[in-house]
Every structure is written in structure tokens, then in C-alpha cells.
């Protein structure tokens, strides 16, 4: 595979810490993101026995309990909430409409951690996932969660819920962090400004250091044994209401101006600040009448 070709020099050391490596041939013309989704939706065909799949942007915190896996297919809701209350509800709804897919009535399952049994039912489910992911790709959507949740709908919600502690999505909540089995820190779509990130493994500078440092285990020793130390000292988790407010386009525009080093952006920001002060004063005056 294409990934195997990159495992040279210092990067090859990671193979010393694996029990088994399987090389799957993929289309070399596809980008890494598409290849990873292809493998993800096909993985049931390449692995024997029941297994727990986890995304690469995750960090183990505590041992698993096999008794927690009681159904053929299991996952955790995206955002740890019902779909109706999910901050990206409207986004997923519009994307599903574009793809002509169905959306769940209760939970939109996050594809980052999935338990999959080795049964005929699960093999059929995974085959259908791959087929619908290909349909999604043909329509320009290469991510896998839309097809996953559509196939879950077609199979009468076959995906049952595992304990939330197996997929603690720290960008959404810290509710399950204390008893976390696995932290899902979301390494994709990183911010340009690393000061906005609350977790060390979300930062591009961290992974650049990993690539340059051949002694991988010494670099990760502290992280594996003390994962909570990866949080920034100034980490703040907003409540749902605040997150919705921050999705407002006005805030987004002002935030863009504040980050820009351009002269015109600084001028516009000053004008906005002056306008905001005048608006607050006028609002207070009118409210007293």
C-alpha cells in the first residue's frame, strides 16, 4: 500500500510497537483521506473475529471491558447528544438531502469508534456501508458518517449505543472525561491558530516534532501514561448555548478581522467596535423608556 512506502527511516520504528501489520492495496491515485475511508468501510472483510475499530486521532486512557460490547454493531452518538440537539444538526441534514440519504430519528452515530462482530449480519451491514459510501463519493462527499448513518437507518437502527466513555469527543463535552476509556480529540480540520486548541495532539507542531524525532516511545511516554496533561492550562469548554452563538456569521466575521494582520481588517474592526459601543448605549437608552 501507499502508506507502507512511507514507513522508512525514523517512521519505520512504529512497526516495532505493532502486533500485526496488514498491507491492503488501494488505488494509488486516490488521496490519503479517500483511501482511509475505503479501508474503513471495507475493514470487516480483512479482519477475522470481533473487533473494536478506533480512528487514528484517539488516545487510550483506560483498559476496555469486554462486557460493554453486547450487540453486533455499537457506537457513540456524535456530540454525545440526540441528533435534534446536535450543534451540527442542520449541516448533516442539508448534506443528507444533497446525497438523498436518510437521517436518524434519534442519534447520529460518530464513526470514530465502532464495535463490529464477525457475523453475517455485520458483514452485510459493512458491505452496504461501502456501497453507499461509494454513492456518496460519486456525489462529491468523501466522508463516511453520512453513509454510515444512512445504512443504520436502512437496517432499523442496528447500531446500538456503547458507553460514551469509549469515544469521549472533547471538542463537544467534558462530561465523560473523568471515566474515559478513549479520548477522541479530532485531528482533522486543525485550526491555523494553535492557541485556539485545548489538546496538545490537535496541534500540527506536535506532529511535526513526532516526524522529526526518531525516538517515538520516549516522546509518547508522558502522553500515554498521563493523557490529561495534554490539555492546555487555559482550556475552556463552552456550553451548548454559547456554541450556537459562536456559530453566528457576525461573530465569525469579527473573529476573522481580529486574526488578520491586514491594515484594512484592523480599520474595519475599529469601526465595528465603535458601532457596537454606540449600539449598546442606544439599546440601554431605549430600554429605559
Labelled PLM ranges:
Residues 1-289:
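Glycosyltransferase catalytic domains, chiefly GT-A lineage
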Amino acid at each position: 500500500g501507499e502508506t507502507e512506502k512511507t514507513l522508512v527511516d525514523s517512521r519505520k520504528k512504529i512497526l516495532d510497537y505493532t502486533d500485526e501489520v496488514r498491507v491492503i492495496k488501494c488505488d494509488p491515485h486516490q488521496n490519503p483521506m479517500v483511501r482511509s475511508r475505503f479501508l474503513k468501510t471495507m475493514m470487516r472483510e480483512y479482519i477475522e473475529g470481533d473487533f473494536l475499530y478506533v480512528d487514528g486521532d484517539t488516545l487510550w486512557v483506560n483498559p476496555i471491558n469486554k462486557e460493554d460490547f453486547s450487540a453486533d454493531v455499537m457506537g457513540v452518538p456524535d456530540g454525545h447528544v440526540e441528533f435534534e440537539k446536535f450543534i451540527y444538526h442542520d449541516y448533516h441534514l442539508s448534506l443528507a438531502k444533497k446525497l438523498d440519504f436518510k437521517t436518524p430519528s434519534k442519534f447520529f452515530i460518530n464513526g470514530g469508534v465502532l464495535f463490529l462482530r464477525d457475523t453475517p449480519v455485520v458483514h452485510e451491514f459493512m458491505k452496504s456501508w461501502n456501497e453507499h459510501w461509494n454513492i456518496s463519493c460519486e456525489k462529491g462527499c468523501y466522508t463516511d458518517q453520512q453513509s454510515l448513518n444512512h445504512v443504520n437507518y436502512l437496517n432499523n437502527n442496528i447500531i446500538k449505543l456503547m458507553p460514551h466513555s469509549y469515544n469521549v469527543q472533547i471538542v463537544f463535552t467534558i462530561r465523560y472525561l473523568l471515566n474515559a476509556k478513549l479520548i477522541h480529540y479530532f485531528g482533522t480540520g486543525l485550526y491555523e491558530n494553535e492557541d485556539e486548541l485545548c489538546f496538545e495532539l490537535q496541534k500540527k507542531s506536535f506532529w511535526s516534532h513526532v516526524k522529526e524525532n526518531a525516538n517515538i516511545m520516549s516522546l509518547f511516554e508522558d502522553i500515554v501514561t498521563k493523557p490529561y496533561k495534554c490539555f492546555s492550562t487555559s482550556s475552556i469548554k463552552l456550553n451548548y448555548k454559547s456554541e450556537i452563538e459562536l456559530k453566528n456569521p457576525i461573530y465569525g466575521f469579527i473573529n476573522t478581522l481580529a486574526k488578520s494582520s491586514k491594515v484594512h481588517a484592523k480599520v474595519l474592526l475599529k469601526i465595528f467596535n465603535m458601532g457596537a459601543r454606540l449600539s449598546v448605549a442606544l439599546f440601554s437608552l431605549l430600554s429605559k423608556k
